[in-house]
Swiss-Prot record:
Belongs to the GPI family. CDD domains: SIS_PGI_1, SIS_PGI_2. InterPro entries: G6P_Isomerase, G6P_Isomerase_C, Phosphoglucose_isomerase_CS, SIS_dom_sf, SIS_PGI_1, SIS_PGI_2. Pfam families: PGI. The active site is at E355 (proton donor), H386, K513. Its EC number is 5.3.1.9. This is Glucose-6-phosphate isomerase. It comes from Baumannia cicadellinicola subsp. Homalodisca coagulata. GO terms for molecular function: carbohydrate derivative binding; glucose-6-phosphate isomerase activity; monosaccharide binding. It is an enzyme of class 5 (isomerase).
Length: 553
């Protein structure tokens, strides 16, 4: 990949001039000028996902210049570099090949001239066999009872992705009860224990290194809880499996090495749900549905690699975000799925976006003087309408939004889904077009005085011109969800290429982990701590003065 500072490109300079010319443009006027704006600013994928980006503050010239920026930053060759196994994660000297995990064409993908697909397929085959044993009841616990509850213990990418997918695809769920534990706060796992029976519970310990502090703390607590009933450590092998690369520590824990599922250093944590980390997905939904998830993602991979930039959905989304973040100064982006099953989708994308592109050093090692990653947040509609939409409509911060909604519901109860769709479509229209003084004045009832009108009208005006993308999915199926996740993954990668940053490391996360280990040893003693700044010293020492006292109020 070439390391190109985007603000030094001709396209960036042209975009700045273009922005100065159209920064006051109204979305309302763009629609008046182009009766075919929806047709000209929308794209469809596989007759399953429609992207409508017409309600944005962009023109055909904006897009022309944004695509020119992508080409000048060598995006097509960067895409080819990732898919061909080049080590584009240079700070860790690794390839980035989560796309190989869902390579349903099974074409050769090589790292250092070695085809990795045989290893990928071997793990998938092992996952299929294991899932069939658990789901069928063939796998028995230590008292001979089949497994009924599964607990995935992991954090970050080992939790957010699998949890999001199993929730989003609950209509496809089988009889197994799936639980997720991530937080090192003992409350998280303690609350799970209340509903579990050691005789019928299986734990999945998801940690690449098998040393992640939060995961291993929870794993050992689960082990201790299990042994209080089972007593004999030999039974651990029937109730614990590992998703890891650290065979030695897995065996020391008591897990049978045959029950360790491998993945590789070319799989980043936040892109790992396609790997053995997705074992919880396959167990919860059945392996056939896990394969459909992979197939949908692979189909979007093919779209990303084979479609011209001008019609490429991930590229379009990425460029629009760069346009808002760098030229308009819109710093955040809301992800709003109008589907209750998708309630964890925004949290999942929050990690993907912010851990990938939350960088301030470019690929040349220089401090960046432009904007990189946006702040990603969101909640499901319609709940969010009664939470933060007031700010979206009338606040001083403009927040570009992605509205995601299925055309077909899994639960066609009365007119519920029609009302959900109506709210989704109406909100994007209201955000774009607003409500003018004239419109409000016309709605006043007869007999209202001019003075009364003037006193209230300013508070009711909604200026509109708030940009949105609408993503209409035919139905939230395993295939379509896979494609949707892949769409956002490639959006993130596209942004990183153009913004000249490394998207697949996370050194900021590593810093916090290291310092936490240092503080942990200090918390274990009664000694007064003075080695930090006054704030950290004060917090630690107050904790020590309070920890043995119960609340008397």
């Amino acid at each position: 990949m070439k390391n190109i500072n985007p603000i030094n490109t001709n396209a960036w300079n042209s975009l700045q001039q273009h922005f100065n010319n159209i920064k006051e443009v109204k979305i309302r006027d763009l629609f008046l000028l182009d009766s075919q704006r929806f047709d000209n600013f929308s794209a469809i994928f596989d007759n399953q996902i429609l992207l409508d980006y017409s309600k944005n503050r962009i023109t055909t010239e904006t897009l022309y210049l944004l695509f020119a920026l992508a080409k000048e930053c060598d995006l097509p060759n960067a895409i080819a570099a990732m898919f061909s196994g080049q080590k584009i994660n240079r700070t860790e000297d690794r390839a980035v090949l989560h796309i190989a995990l869902r390579n349903r064409s099974n074409k050769i993908i090589a790292i250092d001239s070695q085809d990795i697909m045989p290893e990928v397929n071997a793990v998938l085959s092992k996952m299929r066999q294991f899932c069939n044993q658990i789901i069928s009841g063939q796998w028995k616990g230590y008292t001979g009872k089949p497994i009924t509850n599964i607990v995935n213990i992991g954090i970050g990418g080992s939790d957010l992705g699998p949890y999001m997918v199993t929730e989003a695809l609950r209509p496809y769920k089988n009889h197994l009860n799936m639980h997720f534990v991530s937080n090192v706060d003992g409350t998280h796992i303690t609350e799970k224990f209340k509903y579990l029976d050691p005789e019928t519970t299986l734990f999945l310990i998801a940690s690449k290194t098998f040393t992640t502090q939060e995961t291993m703390t929870n794993a050992h607590s689960a082990r201790n809880w299990f042994l209080k009933t089972a007593v004999n450590e030999q039974y651990i092998a029937q109730h614990f499996v590992a998703i890891s690369t650290n065979a030695n520590d897995v065996v020391k824990f008591g897990i049978n090495i045959n029950n360790m599922f491998q993945f590789w250093d070319w799989v980043g944590g936040r892109y790992s749900l396609w790997s053995a980390i997705g074992l919880s997905i396959a167990l919860s939904l059945g392996f056939e549905n896990f394969e459909l998830l992979l197939e949908g993602a692979h189909a979007m991979d093919c779209h990303f690699t084979e479609t011209q930039l001008e019609h490429n959905l991930p590229v379009i989304l990425a460029l629009i975000n760069i346009w808002y973040n760098n030229f308009f100064g819109f710093e955040t982006e809301a992800i709003i799925p109008y589907d209750q099953y998708m309630h964890r989708f925004a949290a999942y994308l929050q990690q993907c976006h912010m851990e990938s592109n939350g960088k301030s050093i470019d690929r040349n090692g220089n401090i960046i003087n432009y904007q990189t990653g946006s702040i990603i947040w969101g909640e499901p509609g319609t709940n969010s309408q009664h939470s933060f939409y007031q700010l979206l409509h009338q606040g001083t911060k403009i927040v570009p939004c992605d509205f995601i909604v299925p055309a077909i519901s899994h639960n066609p109860l009365g007119d519920h889904h029609l009302k959900l769709l109506a709210n989704c479509f109406a909100q994007t229209e209201a955000l774009a077009f607003g409500k003018s003084c004239q419109f409000i004045e016309e709605k006043f009832i007869m007999g209202t005085t001019s003075e009364q009108k003037l006193s209230i009208i300013p508070f009711k005006v909604c200026g509109g011109n708030r940009p949105t993308n609408s993503i209409l999915v035919k139905q939230i199926t395993p295939y379509n969800l896979g494609a949707l996740i892949s769409l956002y993954e490639h959006k993130i990668f596209t942004q990183s290429v153009i913004l000249n940053i490394y998207a697949f490391d996370q050194w900021g996360v590593e810093l916090g982990k290291t310092q936490a280990n240092s503080v942990l040893s200090e918390l274990a003693t009664d000694n007064i701590v003075t080695c930090h700044n006054s704030s950290t010293n004060g917090l630690i020492n107050y904790y020590k003065s309070w920890r043995y006292k119960t609340d008397d109020k």
